[in-house]
Amino acid sequence: MTSRTDVAQMIDHTLLKPEATPDQVAALAKEAGELGTYSICVSPNQLPVDVPSGVHVATVVGFPSGAVKTEVKAAETGRAVKDGAEEIDMVVNLSQVKSHDYAAVEADIKAVRDAAPAPVIVKVIIESAALDDEEIVATCQAAERAGADFVKTSTGFHPAGGASVHAVKLMAETVEGRLGVKASGGIRDAEAAQAMIDAGATRLGLSSSAAVLEGFEA
């Protein structure tokens, strides 16, 4: 089993409820420092946010539907970077994915990549539970062509569901280590987290980080 410290450094400690208050975000940041998580992930309206030393700041773009114009995603990304975001978790345009217009999917992602140049990290949320296997593979390939750093399973808000071991494994096999793979949505205990890691996840999006980490040995 992966060590607690190693798992903590894979976690984006997440609070994306629209009703989250600044006090709750501050508490999230404090807890991230105590738990030793890699980052916090909060909504862009909460930026800038103070975090303990060693904790990174991630935010979301086009969230949760992805159904906004590409230029809006790019503008949202630029503002988030200006406000201190070190990592951007963007949602693909699912209509384009379902239409199998992968050139458009790639262009949408590339616009965000261009608005968040390295060293900012760009993660692409593909909403894997809403896709078939061919769509998962093709969307991951589009993300790689567009210059993304990670592919990510889910927003956690889609009715189709969150991360699955099958999707994570397929995503990891597709990107073959060239991109990271983030599993998020419905991971609430150590057993589920370890299953995602074993399937190939290199980052975990968790709102229940403390409960998950309790199940790992130090």
Curated annotation (Swiss-Prot):
Example of a GO MF term: deoxyribose-phosphate aldolase activity
Reaction(s) this enzyme catalyzes, per UniProt: 2-deoxy-D-ribose 5-phosphate = D-glyceraldehyde 3-phosphate + acetaldehyde
Catalytic site positions: D89 (proton donor/acceptor), K152 (schiff-base intermediate with acetaldehyde), K182 (proton donor/acceptor)
Domain of life: Bacteria
UniProt signal peptide: none
Known pathway: Carbohydrate degradation; 2-deoxy-D-ribose 1-phosphate degradation; D-glyceraldehyde 3-phosphate and acetaldehyde from 2-deoxy-alpha-D-ribose 1-phosphate: step 2/2
Stored InterPro entries: Aldolase_TIM, DeoC, DeoC/FbaB/LacD_aldolase, DeoC_typeI
Keyword list, A-Z: Cytoplasm, Lyase, Schiff base
GO BP annotation list: 2-deoxyribose 1-phosphate catabolic process; carbohydrate catabolic process; deoxyribonucleotide catabolic process
EC code: 4.1.2.4
CDD domains documented for this protein: DeoC
GO cellular component: cytoplasm
Pfam families per the UniProt record, alphabetical: DeoC (PF01791)
Chief location: cytoplasm
Cell compartment(s), UniProt: Cytoplasm
Recorded family membership: Belongs to the DeoC/FbaB aldolase family. DeoC type 1 subfamily.
HAMAP family: DeoC_type1
Function comment: Catalyzes a reversible aldol reaction between acetaldehyde and D-glyceraldehyde 3-phosphate to generate 2-deoxy-D-ribose 5-phosphate.
UniProt-recorded name of the protein: Deoxyribose-phosphate aldolase
Organism from which the protein derives: Corynebacterium aurimucosum (strain ATCC 700975 / DSM 44827 / CIP 107346 / CN-1) (Corynebacterium nigricans)
Taxonomy of the source species: Bacteria, Bacillati, Actinomycetota, Actinomycetes, Mycobacteriales
Gene coding for it: deoC
